[in-house]
């Protein structure tokens, strides 16, 4: 008998599972706020050079005649953001006048920012514009680098230390580093603490998903995965609302970091994965956890009858060949695991490139930043409803592949939207982003089901590393737009379609119990191949019999 049978006996979908899932998914929702935070804290307001300090007019008028005389206009008739005249051009104050070839220079005395929407951002505070504009993208890349490092570190630690310890530490690290980011006043310190925050993103997501999935019965894993997606949707909507109410970037940074101190405090009462405890010889603690689960689910008597011997009868066949010392090579050692790993590398990387390419630069759509953020969050709800139905009734593989391919096609189609139609362009991009967000959540669940328990955390961490590489690559792909406007959408769309094709190679896991060991995984694949071969053989024999039967002559 399997461990899932033991969960069924103790109440597989009771009050414990509901409370446990809610407490783990709430922090995941707020992580979405941190992921997209720089859309607001690093927003670039309209700006232009400050006039020369040695002119008395500079202190009296930065918007009228003085502005027209000192700042050239760009092609759209707005003040040039990065250049100013070397000397005031008073002749420009005359109607319909122009001075072609007037000498200009950089913004030696700083910039004047429009603070009507954003009273303060890191761009204003450290002048991350013009020649320094790449530092803004660098800050986001540093955050994504932290997510990348965290995926490798926390994925490996969880296999050795369990899920609970790294999760508790991640909550504390995020609360502390988030507060420090809001406190320190240097750009270098900002980047350091954003890196530490990025690390916790992986630590929280990977361990939360594993704890939710491993305490869920087979029939509840799909719902748990979809709830994770809804928590991300809620987090994006919360970000839009909180950012609208709290405009200064330091206050906003602190406001979305402080709740993780509360998550840190209650996380001490979350139980460790009993699967992991059993695999690492801590059966007594596993029994105690299962007894608490049984009591909370109204199965106290069943829990009291649970002993090490009874538990071993459920799991003996599954854990007999478990080796608790695993390395990254185990992800490539056997054929079945190797195929899963290679496909997931492509899927996670490509999905991430397309997703962050759309979602991390909302100002390019030309609409209200708060409105676009809310729209990009709301669109996830119908996408998740469709994903829920298809994952339950159709399967994981078809759902993920369809969403990825559809998203890729929509991103490429956005190239053909006429200029000046911001609403149509934003709506189409939002639909593509909804498909990518849904596929991302489905892939988290799918990955956890594809890998066996003994290397599940390592596998999810390794796959997540490639997603973070994709997140690092997305800003670089965006810069290709300076050479050709078609390169970014073609790149994002093509990678999404490639990921969808890679999904088709994987095995369907709908309504299948979690595999505990690598050996069991190989046996399942071989048995599946043998069964398919037998079915094909049987079908071939039946067709041969049909051709030879008298019935054929009457058709």
Swiss-Prot record:
CDD domains: MFS_SLC22A6_OAT1_like
Extracellular side of membrane: 45-137, 188-194, 247-250, 361-373, 419-429, 507-555
Region Disordered: start-end pairs: 526-555
Alphabetized UniProt keyword annotations: Glycoprotein, Ion transport, Membrane, Transmembrane, Transmembrane helix, Transport
Entry's transmembrane regions: 24-44, 138-158, 167-187, 195-215, 226-246, 251-271, 340-360, 374-394, 398-418, 430-450, 486-506
InterPro entries per UniProt: MFS_dom, MFS_sugar_transport-like, MFS_trans_sf
Cellular component annotations (GO), alphabetically ordered: membrane
Glycosylation sites: 54, 114
Compartments where found: Membrane
UniProt biased composition (Basic and acidic residues): 526-540
Membrane topology designation: Multi-pass membrane protein
Main localization (coarse): membrane
Record-level Gene Ontology MF annotations: transmembrane transporter activity
A GO BP entry: organic anion transport
Cytoplasmic side stretches: 1-23, 159-166, 216-225, 272-339, 395-397, 451-485
Role according to the record: Organic anion transporter that mediates the uptake of estrone sulfate. Inhibited by probenecid, propionate, 2-methylbutyrate, 3-methylbutyrate, benzoate, heptanoate and 2-ethylhaxanoate. May act as an odorant transporter.
Family recorded in the similarity comment: Belongs to the major facilitator (TC 2.A.1) superfamily. Organic cation transporter (TC 2.A.1.19) family.
Name the UniProt record assigns to this protein: Solute carrier family 22 member 20
Native species: Homo sapiens (Human)
């Amino acid at each position: 008998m399997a461990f899932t049978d033991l969960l069924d006996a103790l109440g597989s979908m009771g009050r414990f599972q509901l409370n446990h899932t809610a407490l783990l998914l709430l922090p995941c929702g707020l992580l979405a706020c941190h992921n997209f935070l720089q859309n607001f804290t690093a927003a670039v307001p309209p700006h232009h050079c400050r006039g020369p300090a040695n002119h008395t007019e500079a202190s009296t008028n930065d918007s009228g005649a003085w502005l027209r005389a000192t700042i050239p206009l760009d092609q759209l008739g707005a003040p040039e953001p990065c250049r100013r005249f070397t000397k005031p051009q008073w002749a420009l104050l005359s109607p319909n006048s122009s001075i072609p070839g007037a000498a200009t220079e950089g913004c030696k005395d700083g910039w004047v920012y429009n603070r009507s929407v954003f009273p303060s951002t890191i761009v204003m505070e450290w002048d991350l514009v013009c020649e320094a504009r790449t530092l803004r993208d660098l800050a986001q890349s540093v955050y994504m680098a932290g997510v990348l490092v965290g995926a490798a570190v926390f994925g490996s630690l969880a296999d050795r230390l369990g899920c609970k310890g790294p999760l508790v530490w991640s909550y504390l690290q995020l609360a502390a580093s988030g507060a420090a980011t809001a406190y320190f006043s240097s750009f270098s310190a900002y980047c350091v603490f954003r890196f530490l925050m990025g690390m916790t993103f992986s630590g929280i997501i990977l361990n939360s998903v594993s704890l939710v999935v491993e305490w869920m019965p087979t029939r509840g894993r799909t719902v748990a995965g979809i709830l994770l997606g809804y928590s991300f949707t809620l987090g994006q909507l919360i970000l839009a609302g909180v950012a609208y109410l709290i405009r200064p970037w330091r206050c906003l940074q602190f406001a979305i970091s402080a709740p993780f101190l509360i998550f840190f405090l209650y996380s001490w009462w979350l139980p460790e994965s009993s699967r992991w405890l059993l695999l690492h010889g801590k059966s007594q603690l596993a029994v105690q956890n299962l007894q608490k689960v049984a009591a909370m689910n109204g199965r106290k008597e069943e829990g009291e009858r649970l002993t090490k011997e009874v538990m071993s009868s459920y799991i003996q066949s599954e854990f007999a060949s478990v080796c608790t010392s695993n390395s990254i090579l185990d992800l490539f050692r056997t054929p079945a695991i190797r195929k899963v790993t290679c496909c997931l590398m492509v899927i996670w990387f490509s999905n991430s490139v397309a997703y962050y390419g759309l979602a991390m630069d909302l100002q390019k759509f030309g609409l209200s930043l708060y409105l676009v953020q809310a729209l990009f969050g709301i669109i996830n709800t119908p996408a998740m409803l469709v994903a829920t139905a298809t994952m339950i009734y159709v399967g994981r593989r078809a759902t993920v592949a369809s969403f990825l391919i559809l998203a890729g096609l929509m991103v490429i189609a956005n190239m053909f939207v006429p200029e000046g139609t911001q609403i149509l362009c934003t709506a189409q991009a939002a639909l593509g982003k909804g498909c990518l967000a849904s596929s991302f959540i489905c892939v988290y669940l799918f990955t956890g089901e594809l890998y066996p328990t003994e290397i599940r955390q390592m596998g999810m961490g390794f796959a997540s590393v490639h997603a973070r590489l994709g997140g690092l690559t997305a800003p670089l792909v965006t810069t290709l737009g300076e050479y050709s406007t078609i390169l970014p959408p073609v790149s994002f769309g093509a990678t999404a379609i490639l990921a969808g094709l890679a999904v088709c190679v994987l095995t369907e896991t709908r309504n299948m119990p979690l595999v505990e060991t690598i050996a069991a995984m190989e046996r399942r694949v071989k048995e599946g191949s043998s069964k398919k071969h037998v079915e094909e053989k049987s079908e071939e024999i039946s067709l041969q019999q049909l051709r030879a039967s008298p019935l054929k002559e009457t058709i």
